[in-house]
């Protein structure tokens, strides 16, 4: 059997466009002699559709898209498998199903419905879908093919020490005589995820002694980035075919001969994270209808990284920087911002906020009489910069990219309606220590566009004289180590202090900052997820609450 993996980048809700995309890939697969092409989970609707499935008519249009794809591929000498939103035959509960259809010669040969609906991290499928109760083997000549949808293959009872569900759908199908697994996925990227998929499917191949096919969606949809990285394994767990990472691909593998297309790119995890941010930015803009971006260039490392990512995502002609010096901005920061912009080949305007700041201070002076200057005056500067960027955004129709990193956002070292203003938080899931690593990646791609001084200068918001981040925060190496354990692994403060050999009071202080700044994060622009636990849709904490583990 020659199997093609249609690693496509669908757009959520664009049913006609997604059908056309699958039809185009199907024709290309037929030209390469494939007997079968397999597309990812919910390809025809895009993943995740979220509450779109609640809209009247959406399920019917999704099912009509299946019929349309069957019609458009009817004359092709191959079978097509694609994911879609179907309607449940059960009279109670949710009406939508996460399903897959097997198409041949214009007809639907079989349908399969996802049984295990994930409700962790960025997944909330039980909110919208009803699970399937049974599954069927696809009889294809002498072959018994197991077709599963994402999570149904992610509950191997021997691979995981604590499976999330009582059922193991793959094992059930293998016990019924399956000799091949086709797993269609919308599996998001995060650090280490590509290797985890390989290890998990290899364990299943070893256990069942059967070939494994894993096809994955590629592209960015809101906060989630899908890397593709599809693959085919033989019964020994050897990868015999693999798709590219972070781009569409058509991969053909011959199960009988054990040969297929092999691609291996972005093998370094830092390169992979950088490329995920580029893809996430590009797709967010493209799918939302934007073509140009605005970035506040401070001369610091965060805005520098955001700028090089933006240039890779949409091209230098569509990136516009704005330097906004204030009363405490250093001359070297303004020079560094313009030097980088010139090397990148992007436009950079200078709009001083000092006159507006001075006027604002004068305006508020009668009301502030008798008080000392504090963080209020610092935040006025940040909010004037936000106002400037949003005004330019309105005037020129460009999307503002915020430049805050995960470390700052975690502890609230950011200003609501100030530096948090924007439409997409590109590096909001990137810890500060990783910002430097990714900036080296971007700098290499752009021939040293980021001045070395930007890497070497102490981080500073420059909102008061001689200010440094270290005045308010622990060293970023220490802060990021605490945040990784507290935010991503949900570890307790005493456990963290012991493991990192840090003072308990320091860890408590960081944890309290994280907990008390939830209100800021819930008003932030959507951010691109690249770690195992990002702020956003995958981390849901109450704002009005009094459970502080550090007390």
What do these predicted regions represent?
Residues 1-296, 312-313, 323, 348:
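Enzyme catalytic cores with a strong preference for nitrogen-chemistry domains
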């Amino acid at each position: 059997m020659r199997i093609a993996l249609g690693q496509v980048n669908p757009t959520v809700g664009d049913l006609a466009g997604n059908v056309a995309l699958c039809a185009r890939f199907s024709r290309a697969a037929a030209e390469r002699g494939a007997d079968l092409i397999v597309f990812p989970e919910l390809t025809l609707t895009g993943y995740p559709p979220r509450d779109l499935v609640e809209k009247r008519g959406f399920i019917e249009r999704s099912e009509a898209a299946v019929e349309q794809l069957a019609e458009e591929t009817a004359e092709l000498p191959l079978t097509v498998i694609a994911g879609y939103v179907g309607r449940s035959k059960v009279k109670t509960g949710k009406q939508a199903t996460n399903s897959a259809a097997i198409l041949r010669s214009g007809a639907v040969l079989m349908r399969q419905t996802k049984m295990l609906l994930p409700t962790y991290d960025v997944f909330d499928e039980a909110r919208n879908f009803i699970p399937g109760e049974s599954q069927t083997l696809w009889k294809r000549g002498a072959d018994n093919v197991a077709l599963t949808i994402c999570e149904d293959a992610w509950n191997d009872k021997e691979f995981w020490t604590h499976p999330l569900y009582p059922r193991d759908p793959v094992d059930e199908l293998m016990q019924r005589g399956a000799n091949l697994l086709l797993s269609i996925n919308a599996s998001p990227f995060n650090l280490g995820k590509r290797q985890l998929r390989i290890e998990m499917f290899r364990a299943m191949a070893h256990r069942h002694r059967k070939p494994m096919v894993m096809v994955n969606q590629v592209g960015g949809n809101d906060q989630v980035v899908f890397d593709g990285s599809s693959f085919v394994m033989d019964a020994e767990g050897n990868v015999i075919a693999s798709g590219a990472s972070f781009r569409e691909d058509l991969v053909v593998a011959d199960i009988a001969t054990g040969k297929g297309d092999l691609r291996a790119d972005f093998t370094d995890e830092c390169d992979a994270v950088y490329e995920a941010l580029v893809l996430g930015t590009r797709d967010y803009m493209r799918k939302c209808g934007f073509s140009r971006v605005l970035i506040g260039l401070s001369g610091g490392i965060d805005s520098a990284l955001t700028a090089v990512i933006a240039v890779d995502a949409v091209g230098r002609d569509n990136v516009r920087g704005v330097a906004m010096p204030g009363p405490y901005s250093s001359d070297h920061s303004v020079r560094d911002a313009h030097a980088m912009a010139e090397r990148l080949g992007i436009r950079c305007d200078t709009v001083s906020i000092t006159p507006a700041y001075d006027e604002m201070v004068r305006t508020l002076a009668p009301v502030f009489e008798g008080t000392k200057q504090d963080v209020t005056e610092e935040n006025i500067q940040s909010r004037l910069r936000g106002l400037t960027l949003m005004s330019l955004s309105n005037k020129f129709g460009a999307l503002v990219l915020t430049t805050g990193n995960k470390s700052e956002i975690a502890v609230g070292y950011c200003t609501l309606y100030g530096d948090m203003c924007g439409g997409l938080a590109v590096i909001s899931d990137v810890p500060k220590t990783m910002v430097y690593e990714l900036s080296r990646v971007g700098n290499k791609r752009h021939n040293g566009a980021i001045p070395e001084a930007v890497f070497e200068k102490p981080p500073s918001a420059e909102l008061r004289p001689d200010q440094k981040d270290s005045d308010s925060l622990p060293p970023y190496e220490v802060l990021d180590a605490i945040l990784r354990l507290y935010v991503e692994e949900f570890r307790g403060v005493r456990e963290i202090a012991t493991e990192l050999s840090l003072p308990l009071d320091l860890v408590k202080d960081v944890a309290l900052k994280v907990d008390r700044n939830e209100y800021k994060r819930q008003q932030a622009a959507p951010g691109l997820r690249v770690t195992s636990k990002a702020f956003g849709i995958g981390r849901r904490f109450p704002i009005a609450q009094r459970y502080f583990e550090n007390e």
